[in-house]
Amino acid sequence: MLIAFQGAVFALVLLSFVLIVAVPVALASPGEWERSQRLIYAGAALWTSLIIVIGVLDSVVANQA
């Protein structure tokens, strides 16, 4: 279970870096927001889901220790 927790945290960090770069670029480029709006919303939904999954996994891992 610890490996799943670490994998989820790694995925969250990686996705955060991608969103940190992608969102400002999409907002600053003319016409880019309309093209990438669904992708950015999907990334934000995935980011939120990872936060919830990490919270659940953290409680499971903490109870095993």
From Swiss-Prot:
Record flagged with keyword Transcription: no
Membrane topology: Multi-pass membrane protein
Family matches, as Pfam families: Ycf9 (PF01737)
Single GO BP term: photosystem II stabilization
Primary localization class, coarse: plastid
Subcellular location(s) of the protein: Plastid, Cyanelle thylakoid membrane
Positions of transmembrane segments: 8-28, 41-61
Keywords for the protein's UniProt record, in alphabetical order: Cyanelle, Membrane, Photosynthesis, Photosystem II, Plastid, Reaction center, Thylakoid, Transmembrane, Transmembrane helix
Any GO CC annotation of this UniProt entry: photosystem II reaction center
Keyword flag Cytoplasm: no
Top-rank taxon: Eukaryota
Function comment: May control the interaction of photosystem II (PSII) cores with the light-harvesting antenna, regulates electron flow through the 2 photosystem reaction centers. PSII is a light-driven water plastoquinone oxidoreductase, using light energy to abstract electrons from H(2)O, generating a proton gradient subsequently used for ATP formation.
Subunit-level organization: PSII is composed of 1 copy each of membrane proteins PsbA, PsbB, PsbC, PsbD, PsbE, PsbF, PsbH, PsbI, PsbJ, PsbK, PsbL, PsbM, PsbT, PsbX, PsbY, PsbZ, Psb30/Ycf12, at least 3 peripheral proteins of the oxygen-evolving complex and a large number of cofactors. It forms dimeric complexes.
Similarity comment: family membership: Belongs to the PsbZ family.
Protein name, entry field: Photosystem II reaction center protein Z
Organism lineage: Eukaryota, Glaucocystophyceae, Cyanophoraceae, Cyanophora
Gene from which the chain derives: psbZ
